[in-house]
Swiss-Prot record:
Cellular component per GO, a single term: plasma membrane
Keywords of this entry: Cell membrane, Electron transport, Membrane, NAD, Translocase, Transmembrane, Transmembrane helix, Transport
Reactions the enzyme catalyzes: 2 reduced [2Fe-2S]-[ferredoxin] + Na(+)(in) + NAD(+) + H(+) = 2 oxidized [2Fe-2S]-[ferredoxin] + Na(+)(out) + NADH
Keyword Transport: yes
Protein name from the UniProt record: Na(+)-translocating ferredoxin:NAD(+) oxidoreductase complex subunit A
UniProt function note: Part of a membrane-bound complex that couples electron transfer with translocation of ions across the membrane. Couples electron transfer from reduced ferredoxin to NAD(+) with electrogenic movement of Na(+) out of the cell. Involved in caffeate respiration.
EC number of this enzyme: 7.2.1.2
Natural source organism: Acetobacterium woodii (strain ATCC 29683 / DSM 1030 / JCM 2381 / KCTC 1655 / WB1)
Coiled coil: none
A Pfam family reported for this protein in Swiss-Prot or TrEMBL: Rnf-Nqr
Keyword Translocase: yes
First-tier enzyme category under EC: translocase
Length: 192
């Protein structure tokens, strides 16, 4: 049951975009259309889930036994960069239109602080391997949920009468803030 709690917490209560403000760049940059938001969400989910598992193994099989903890951040960034390259090659071959739509934001997953943040928090919270995977997948699903909801709202705002001073980025920031407040409501949720 604790695995479900870890996942639900990562999706709703500790959403990395809306409560920890990690991954804001792709959240704001790729959320203009639902289709591209879903594509980015799937790519981040794949990278974050694999990065969580691989960084756990690297931390406890290599870095800790060899007392190389000071290389943790560099090692994790290299792992994430390699995974992003893999995802980029897969998307380029399987969906050229999605690859084109994601544009510069796909390589930016390498520097997406949410992916690195999840890997580091998994180690900091001393999760075991299974808990690490559940937290990584939950965090990725939370990112995907947030970016897809935000993209849906932004699509609707494009056809709405928005005051001139709030058109574009200002209304996007206000909307993101309101979403963060809405997700804050989950923090009082009692599970079990």
């Amino acid at each position: 049951m604790t695995l479900i709690f870890i996942m639900i917490s990562a999706i709703f209560v500790n959403n990395f975009v809306l409560s920890r403000f990690l991954g804001i760049c792709p959240f704001l940059g790729v959320s203009k259309q639902v289709e591209t938001a879903v594509g980015m969400g799937v790519a981040v989910t794949f990278v974050m889930a694999l990065a969580s598992a691989i960084t756990y193994v690297v931390q406890y099989a290599i870095l800790d036994p060899l007392s190389l903890g000071y290389l943790q951040t560099i090692a994790f960034i290299l792992i994430i960069a390699a995974l992003v390259q893999l995802v980029e090659m897969i998307i380029k071959k399987s969906s050229p239109s999605l690859y084109q739509a994601l544009g510069v934001y796909l390589p930016l997953i390498t520097t997406n602080c949410a992916v690195l943040g999840v890997a580091l928090i998994n180690i900091q919270n001393e999760y075991n391997f299974i808990e690490t995977i559940f937290n990584g997948v939950g965090a990725a699903l939370g990112f995907t949920l947030a970016i897809v909801l935000f993209a849906g709202i932004r699509e609707r705002l494009e056809t709405s009468a928005v005051p001139k001073a709030l058109e574009g980025f200002p209304i996007a920031l206000l909307t993101a803030g309101l979403m963060a407040i809405a997700f804050l409501g989950f923090s009082g949720m009692k599970l079990g």
